[in-house]
Amino acid sequence: MSGATLLKESGPKEVFCGLTSIVWLHRRMPDAFFLVVGSRTCAHLIQSAAGVMIFAEPRFGTAILEERDLAGLADAHDELNRVVKNLLARRPEIKTLFLVGSCPSEVIKIDLSRVAENLNIELKGQVTVLNYSGSGIETTFTQGEDGALKALIPLMPKSDQKKLLLVGTLANAVEDRLVSIFNRLGIDNVESFPPRQSTELPSIGPETKVLLTQPYLTDTARELKNKGAEIIEAPFPLGVTGSTLWIQAAANSFGIDKSIVDSILNPLISRAKKALEPHVEKLSGKKLFLLPESQLEIPLARFLSNECGMEIVEIGTPYLNRDLMKAEIDLLPPDCRIVEGQHVEKQLDRVRDSSPDLVVCGMGLANPLEAEGISTKWSIEMVFSPIHGIDQASDLAELFSRPLRRHDILNPTKTLTSN
């Protein structure tokens, strides 16, 4: 590994829970439904994050635990069975139903796995019922996707076909572009997980080579490996360098000649670097502090430091899987400080002491920091934006240059003084 300093910290946290991942998962698999077993607070969180109109028919909902459930005056399992049956009667197009645990359901020990098992027996294949936890007690933000994918893996059929499996949710247009590149390289059998329909799961076996698109899929990667798949070690496809190394790792795994890879990637790299130039001009030399939330922090820091010239003050991450992150950490500048976990008060003190030009953080911390004159970027935007791949490098950089340009416009006197 590089000379990066790895530290651990524990204490009060300021992060979204794993329920938030429903917002992009329900868009990815339109034949699935995500039923949160939780409180009105859970319902408000998902509804607000998704921005769904009141008249829409969303593919998620909340079975709200009332006081009777919390006090044990009603059998929560029976109540949940009733809610599920009413839902399926109203929405017969649902093919896969995810029961999603929350803080309240975890606290009162509702056994969602037992509920799912009983419903699968009763429904006799009409709908597949799965469960995972999105509880803030057990998960943060993006880990909800990890739980959902892990729940799907036992349903994946076996196969001896040689294939490349892209694992992690991507924007459809980005995925199509990446698959097209792999096809041009000569890798014809490319599938994605999660699929665009929950019932069209890719097959898996010893000839399956897994290329992770997201860094937060620890449990998913472990389960796929247990199924016999090979995990390709590579940085993640953020920025020109990361995306290039990611594609090259897949090509090497399939024995594709380097000259073929270069002939296809070099024009994309040249175009992407030119598109990056105006953003690099704005970002170069600026100090960046990343607070933990999405587990994208390390790949983002690598991109912003190596390709955009930013000075990294600290990289916070909720969890650090050293195996999945080894290729990323090796590319970081040697003086980087990585902090796993969070004590939010201590981290905020370090933010103030270091006077960064930009802080990447959760929505709950952004406004207070902005009020102190510190420019911020919501980490949630990285998950909702199409930022993966060589072609998207300039769009990714713009997410960080934009708040700095906004700050300059709002503070023209300070900008002139600093210049």
UniProtKB/Swiss-Prot annotation:
GO biological process, alphabetically ordered: light-independent chlorophyll biosynthetic process; photosynthesis, dark reaction
EC number from the UniProt entry: 1.3.7.7
Binding residue positions for [4Fe-4S] cluster: 17, 42, 103
InterPro entries reported for this sequence: LIPOR_BchN/ChlN, Nase/OxRdtase_comp1, Protochl_reductN
Tree of life domain: Bacteria
HAMAP family per record: ChlN_BchN (MF_00352)
Entry protein name: Light-independent protochlorophyllide reductase subunit N
Organism: Prochlorococcus marinus (strain NATL1A)
